[in-house]
Amino acid sequence: MNKTPTTLIIMDGFGLRKETAGNAIANAKKPNLDRIFASNPGCKLSASGLDVGLPAGQMGNSEVGHTNIGAGRVVFQDLPRISKAIQDGDFFTNEAYVSAMDDCKAKGTALHVMGLLSDGGVHSHIEHIFALLDMAKQRGLSRVYIHAFLDGRDVPPSSGKDFVARLQAKCEALGNAKIGVISGRYYAMDRDKRWDRVQKAYDALVLGEGPFEPDPVNAVQKSYDAGVTDEFVVPVVCCKEAVIGGEDSVVFMNFRPDRAREITRCLVDPDFTDVERKKGFFPLHYVCTTEYDVTMPNVTVAFPHHKLTNIFGEYISKLGLTQLRIAETEKYAHVTFFFNGGVEQVFPGEDRVLIPSPKVPTYDLKPDMSAREVTDACVERIESGSYDVIILNFANCDMVGHTGVYEAARLAVETVDECVARVVEATSRMGGITLITADHGNADRMLEDDGVTPYTAHTTNPVPFYICLLYTSPSPRDYAA
């Protein structure tokens, strides 16, 4: 007997904004979504700040959005949790951090601090990095090296120079810290197994290989002069003595797991082979600020995960219902790991489908990404009648939005419009209901206030939520209107 599905479509990065200038969502031709929004019950939802467990005014992100949706409640996030620990003083007595620093003193080794250097608050926060540097000074460490990964996505694309200048000033004030490596997140924070990128970051960190520039601020400026903004800065070595060596302590200050896993595994997993390790594997005292992966060996965790109970996937499973999670690579972790409360757990009756994301340098080069392939696979499984619930993510509005290329983002929105219609129609044919929403905004703002500079970050704008019972696509002429 065929099941009647309830399909949840999460349009990643699809925010609602009144202003139309630089608004790829408002200006895209999207006859399907326009009709769905006009003819079905719906509302706007807040996807930022306190409503999703973040500090007031903090933009939402994919991890936070999927965690809250999957939990069915406000889940307070790691950003405010760590910030509160700093304010309360508990941060400075954290057992994992203390142990790593005491190990340095006992063995005469160096402390390496890695992290995304920005105040974007999505993967990390510069104030958390500064707090750890203060702690290292207080505990009497003499050799501290910071490996700064530049952002350019959750903050303006050329803001990294100012963050590096702030870090350099902090190092000079403390007197015991130096900037070792500067790298764009494109290399050091890949999450799609693009090991050629990760190799460059690893070689800079461990071998000191890469362009050398002793002035960190000038290193970033040289990249700008070459037309390369923060996200894509090729790993630069600023201090030859700052290479990571055996028995050193490493603290990775990123609190969001997905983009911290690959470079961490390169450093801690003796069985890892996807990146060449010319020095071979060597032991480290490695601290993950949060739990990046329960299978990660040879690490300690500073802020362990708080387990969520009775979340959506768990509840559906307990009812004896079947569920499907489907997305392309860039958002697969979000409909699985994050939707399940940040736990690597597959519930009974839960199936997962991963569609590979296209192998392109940046997604403005292929704004449709793998949305049509995701749709094909989803429709096939809807029509199989095997699932009671389907959780689906379309990555385009977020991933293309992050490139800052307006025209590509507009095309991304139009692709999502086409694909949403196919999924809704398939669900309707099976007698099911489709819920359409988003996790946060992004493509709704592609330009800074000057109307020229690309805006690459998320937004704090609301997102849609609609319940669709029956739907058929408009005629082809509506697409050309």
Model feature map: region roles:
Residues P41, D51-L54, Q58-L116, H123-S142, ...:
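His/Asp/Glu-rich, glycine-adjacent segments
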Residues G13-F14, S118-G120, E291, H440-G441:
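Active-site metal-binding loops of divalent metal-dependent hydrolases
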Residues Y471-A481:
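Single conserved hydrophobic/aromatic residue that forms the stacking wall/gate
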Residues A412-G451:
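Metal-dependent active-site segment of extracytoplasmic phospho-/sulfohydrolases and closely related
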Residues E95-A96, S386-C419:
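Active-site His/acidic residue clusters
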Residues L8, H112-M114, V251-F252, V389-N393, ...:
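Structural motif
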Residues M1-N40:
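Active-site-proximal N-terminal segment of extracellular/periplasmic enzymes that hydrolyze or transfer
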Residues A443-I467:
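Conserved, well-ordered active-site substructure
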